[in-house]
Design a protein with these regions (language model features):
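Multi-bladed beta-propeller domains
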Residues: 2-18, 42-57, 89-104, 136-151, ...
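A generic fold-level signal
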Residues: 4, 26, 42, 81-83, ...
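C-terminal closing repeat unit and adjoining cap/tail of repeat-based domains
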Residues: 227-250, 255-272
Length: 274
């Protein structure tokens, strides 16, 4: 589905399977999503599977490189408990390269300069498991923790690469925040009475779309599937927030940035009970 700022909802495809988290390709106009583990690309009714090699259990946290010649995915394994690690591979197929040996790691952003990835990670600190925003060189290396306190998720870069948008419970409810790329100067951008997740900045840097769960339906640190939720839009300075629509969805609806290149539309997924 796609939603325009003017309020028009257009259904572009219906599936008899669960699809999640579309990315909108600038170069081909395809929508890239995960379904049942593999990654697919879709356009004009034609679906093709992307060759992700051994990464055949991808969750809904995947992004394209700035020039779209590569894709980074969060690949899950269950041999030693639940794990998720970030891999990069050529978009036209090839051997995946491990980027984050530590797990669980859930990818959300690729910097515009192509040098860095941002992700949410569960890590042990002082005998406590904390959930924070991290960055790591796209070539691999040492990860860097950017957030401290609260439950922090959904980090993605601003179009100019200077800032990172993320969501955090540090103010109580889950809200959309923004900070500098090095983690400094965090600022709360949404001020909703409900829980706000996954703020996605438009390519022109002017608008942010995000998903909202009712505070009575979930804990602030939860974002589950099969929920009644809403999509909201605000200006990039946090002003003029407004509800766009209600839908049945949640996890998988809009986990990663899905804006069209011209910033007029964004893609999302809603679900139906059979």
């Amino acid at each position: 589905m796609a939603f325009s700022e003017s309020g028009e909802i257009r259904t572009v495809a219906r599936f008899d399977k669960v699809v999640e988290a579309p990315n909108w390709m600038r170069t081909t106009g395809e929508l890239v999503y995960n379904s049942g583990g593999p990654i697919y690309a879709w356009k004009d009714g034609v679906e093709r599977r992307i060759d992700t090699g051994v990464c055949d259990c991808c969750n809904n946290d995947h992004v394209l490189s700035p020039n779209e010649d590569a894709i980074a995915v969060s690949h899950m394994t269950f041999d030693s408990g639940f794990t998720s690690r970030v891999y990069i591979m050529p978009f036209d197929g090839g051997e995946p390269r491990l980027v984050t040996p530590n797990s669980p790691s859930f990818l959300h952003g690729w910097s515009p300069d192509g040098k860095e990835l941002s992700y949410c990670a569960f890590r042990e600190h002082d005998s406590r498991r904390e959930v924070d925003v991290y960055t790591i060189p796209a070539t691999g290396g040492e990860e860097r923790r950017l957030t401290f306190g609260g439950f922090n998720d959904g980090p993605e870069y601003s179009p100019d690469g200077r800032q990172i948008w993320f969501n955090s419970t540090r103010s109580g409810l889950m809200q959309v925040w923004r900070m500098n790329r090095d983690g400094s100067d965090p600022v709360q951008m949404s001020r909703n009475d409900n829980n706000c997740w996954f703020g996605h900045i438009s390519p022109d840097g002017k608008k942010v779309v995000y998903i909202v769960y009712h505070r009575d339906h979930l804990m602030p640190n939860e974002h589950l599937p099969n929920m009644q939720c809403e999509l909201w839009l605000m200006d990039a300075d946090g002003n003029h927030p407004r509800r766009l629509c209600s839908l049945f969805g949640g996890q998988g609806t809009i986990n990663v940035n899905s804006w069209s290149p011209d910033s007029r539309l964004f893609a999302f997924v809603s679900y139906e009970w059979e």
